[in-house]
Amino acid sequence: MLASNSDGASTSVKPSDDAVNTVTPWSILLTNNKPMSGSENTLNNESHEMSQILKKSGLCYDPRMRFHATLSEVDDHPEDPRRVLRVFEAIKKAGYVSNVPSPSDVFLRIPAREATLEELLQVHSQEMYDRVTNTEKMSHEDLANLEKISDSLYYNNESAFCARLACGSAIETCTAVVTGQVKNAFAVVRPPGHHAEPHKPGGFCLFNNVSVTARSMLQRFPDKIKRVLIVDWDIHHGNGTQMAFYDDPNVLYVSLHRYENGRFYPGTNYGCAENCGEGPGLGRTVNIPWSCAGMGDGDYIYAFQRVVMPVAYEFDPDLVIVSCGFDAAAGDHIGQFLLTPAAYAHMTQMLMGLADGKVFISLEGGYNLDSISTSALAVAQSLLGIPPGRLHTTYACPQAVATINHVTKIQSQYWRCMRPKHFDANPKDAHVDRLHDVIRTYQAKKLFEDWKITNMPILRDSVSNVFNNQVLCSSNFFQKDNLLVIVHESPRVLGNGTSETNVLNLNDSLLVDPVSLYVEWAMQQDWGLIDINIPEVVTDGENAPVDILSEVKELCLYVWDNYVELSISKNIFFIGGGKAVHGLVNLASSRNVSDRVKCMVNFLGTEPLVGLKTASEEDLPTWYYRHSLVFVSSSNECWKKAKRAKRRYGRLMQSEHTETSDMMEQHYRAVTQYLLHLLQKARPTSQ
């Protein structure tokens, strides 16, 4: 028979392949164009590509998986049985499947089945299998008691059957991909699986569907499947999947998840970027741990372009499995992320460029029924070859960029595509110095030569020794009526290294130090000056990192109590940048500074707002609001909130810049003119 493409051309198609032509995008590819002259391999490749085009995509769904439910019919649990129904209904409404499998369906329906004991024991222990299976004969009272002592789990007498059905269906669907029955496939299954560890279930998960499937493919098809890539974009870290393959060199596990220093579920540090595998599997775990809520399309696409796809290409898998949770989708009350269906479609499309297109999608989480259905439909359409929609955001936020930079530094030890290889920045030899110490030594020397600015002694055990030589002061600040206290982070060093090493070209490297503008200005005004530099890393006596914010707060209190408060200065001005702002705001909350401090100018960039302690005296927030300028990047999350920021955060000023150093330089003239204006107003009362 003949099928028409979008240009009206006709193409010969076998009768057995008739149903596939109901998908418009495929017919566009079926042209009569002949290959250009070339090798026989070119013809063979095109023949292979044509066979892939003619294959259908697979889909597995069985309504019996909805039998797994809470004991109480009125219990509104997020892992709702309707989740799989809504996904299937969305795909059916789009015209890709029907209730009763039909040859005319766009998707080839894969029959569901239960996983066997032998298959499950490839990942899980016999004890865990028995624990789940025993629930089939438990009374409601025993099931309720088991739920109380379980980790985010519920059971009824059908739960074990549904878990076996979900896992077996995943295996069967993936088998169809590996054997070439379909070109790719989507298993709409529940309960989900990626939190189920080898020895215990947890987090709504009974058996680990993806892990059992991956292990089954490796063992059943050793000639075809030697390397498996598992990409887990569920918003939670897949602790069970990572544990199952942590020492396996043949499985690359990549997880993008909300982490927040281990506070987000599953609530451990197992999903941190530093956990990269062990033994022969070292480097085969790639964790991308997002630091906060609100990540969106641009952040995930950035992660895919910078980490996921480069590592995946280098790994060169024979099969791609996706732990496809939709709880990072916009509207999900648990995830609180902002991914659109287009983002899921784009990520799916990128993965389809691997492993000759052998991609298997297995449903995991996702708890907003509208979000999960629209997102799943977008993934299904990508599997069919339909181009993705447009992204909502096309760039990554600063927090995402910071996370990806951290991940690439760690993974550069294991992947050539992540070069230059990250080096150990902890000096161990006597002839090695940290650059921030070298720069501070240079600054101290230059400031002494230009303005006779010297080191201020820090004589207190509670303040880290790292701050020695980091606090400088003008020689006569005690006797000055006007005093400027600047607390800032180390200056930036901009430079380019070689492509294979971390060696900087010093001739092309620059030191960017906007604080020097304020120092020079204060000295020209004949003011007193205290310059406090905050290193990026603060350590204790044994060179172990400590909480930098606590140390900054302690240092600011020390300088105030032992130096500033004892001076004769009547007009004191604070300038803070980055993490240093925490120290100044804490000082204003902890000491009576309002009589002498005329203004606090803080530069925060994209960092979260820093407010006075909530227990502060009643009129202090009002004083702070009236005596502060807080420059915040226009891309800061605070501007997206409907409510106006409270006064305890100070008087907020928008800046077009994101880096605090850029902001300090850009607003230098406005700030210094404002300080002079305040000084002029203060003079009649101070004389």
Swiss-Prot record:
It comes from the Eukaryota. GO terms for biological process: chromatin organization; epigenetic regulation of gene expression; pericentric heterochromatin formation; rDNA heterochromatin formation; silent mating-type cassette heterochromatin formation; siRNA-independent facultative heterochromatin formation; subtelomeric heterochromatin formation. It is found in: Nucleus; Chromosome, Centromere; Chromosome, Telomere. The keyword Cell membrane does not apply. Keywords: Centromere, Chromatin regulator, Chromosome, Hydrolase, Nucleus, Repressor, Telomere, Transcription, Transcription regulation. Residues 55-385 are annotated as: Histone deacetylase. The active site is at H195. Its EC number is 3.5.1.98. GO terms for cellular component: chromatin; euchromatin; heterochromatin island; histone deacetylase complex; mating-type region heterochromatin; nucleolus; nucleus; pericentric heterochromatin. It catalyses: N(6)-acetyl-L-lysyl-[histone] + H2O = L-lysyl-[histone] + acetate. SUPFAM superfamilies: Arginase/deacetylase. GO terms for molecular function: histone deacetylase activity; histone H3K14 deacetylase activity, hydrolytic mechanism. The keyword Hydrolase applies. Belongs to the histone deacetylase family. HD type 2 subfamily. Responsible for the deacetylation of lysine residues on the N-terminal part of the core histones (H2A, H2B, H3 and H4). Histone deacetylation gives a tag for epigenetic repression and plays an important role in transcriptional regulation, cell cycle progression and developmental events. Histone deacetylases act via the formation of large multiprotein complexes. Required for proper positioning of nucleosomes at heterochromatic loci and for transcriptional gene silencing (TGS) function of the Snf2/Hdac-containing repressor complex (SHREC). Interacts with ccq1, clr1, clr2 and mit1. This is Histone deacetylase clr3. It comes from Schizosaccharomyces pombe (strain 972 / ATCC 24843) (Fission yeast).
